[in-house]
Amino acid sequence: MPSSTAMVPGTRGGWHCLVLTTAAALTQLMWLPGCCGSYIVGGHEVTPHSRPYMASVSFEGHHYCGGFLIHTHWVVSAAHCFSDRDPSMGLVVLGAHALLAPEPTQQTFSIAAAVSHPDFQPATQANDICLLRLNGSAVLGPAVRLLRLPRRNAKPPAAGTRCHVSGWGFVSDFEEPPPGLMEVEVRILDLSVCNSSWQGQLNPAMLCTHSGDRRRRGFCSADSGGPLVCGRRAHGLVSFSGLWCGDPKTPDVYTQVSAFVTWIWDVVRASSSPGSTGRSVRAV
């Protein structure tokens, strides 16, 4: 079973492994009764197609990770989703709400190329970002739209800022799929405060959220790669959480997208758009 780990201080000056809850860690168990849950915690179902930038990355017919559309040929997702998966075997579905039901709005693509950040570190989840090039051009419309990125190297939203994270993870610990795309409101947590909860393992290119109260709210496995949207821009990309999803003792951690905007567009510009017969469109 694939998993991701981070190193935390041990009790005798050594280091112990801390298992992180990532999309890749639990999704292979998605059809086993009683497996650990992988779901948007404390959230609600959104109005169908009201988050038209959302993408589902699937393997063998099952949702595996999230992502979001930034260009008619490119989806952003998490690098750890492909640590032990062959991207060429995956599919990207756009325009979906209920993944288990056929919808005329859905557009399905194979993955022509997957470009993980060259400095991605699986052990710590540093630089956990990947670009997926579609094998065709997405047709933009009411159910399929682009999500804007923050300005390059922009400061992250201030602590306390309300943001939203969405995904198709399970809604119970017993493999119950959601009726449709789920979303939860969270608040930005100061990185230094978050870092103390994570034993100093975070870096400045990460971002944290918490519920803002005592309720468990946040993301969990199979939501990895999805966007944290603040002010209509993707400021974060779901990376990892603690053993218990939405637990304030281990705040949710994201890749801070603004730190990678230059790299993102450098990759897009360097690669020709496969199968394109017209003008490519990107979110600005």
Curated annotation (Swiss-Prot):
Its EC number is 3.4.21.-. GO terms for molecular function: heparin binding; serine-type endopeptidase activity; serine-type peptidase activity. It is found in: Cytoplasmic granule lumen; Secreted. Residues 40-269 form the Peptidase S1 domain. Glycans are attached at N135. It comes from the Eukaryota. SUPFAM superfamilies: Trypsin-like serine proteases. Its main location: cytoplasm. It is an enzyme of class 3 (hydrolase). After cleavage of the signal peptide, the N-terminus is probably further processed by CTSC. Processing by CTSC is probably required for accumulation in cytoplasmic granules; in the absence of CTSC the protein does not accumulate. N-glycosylated. The active site is at H80, D128, S224. Disulfide bonds join C65-C81, C163-C230, C194-C208, C220-C245. GO terms for biological process: proteolysis. One of its GO terms (cellular component) is extracellular space. Keywords: Disulfide bond, Glycoprotein, Heparin-binding, Hydrolase, Protease, Secreted, Serine protease, Signal. Serine protease that cleaves preferentially after Arg residues. Can also cleave after citrulline (deimidated arginine) and methylarginine residues. Belongs to the peptidase S1 family. This is Serine protease 57. The lineage of its organism: Eukaryota, Metazoa, Chordata, Craniata, Vertebrata.
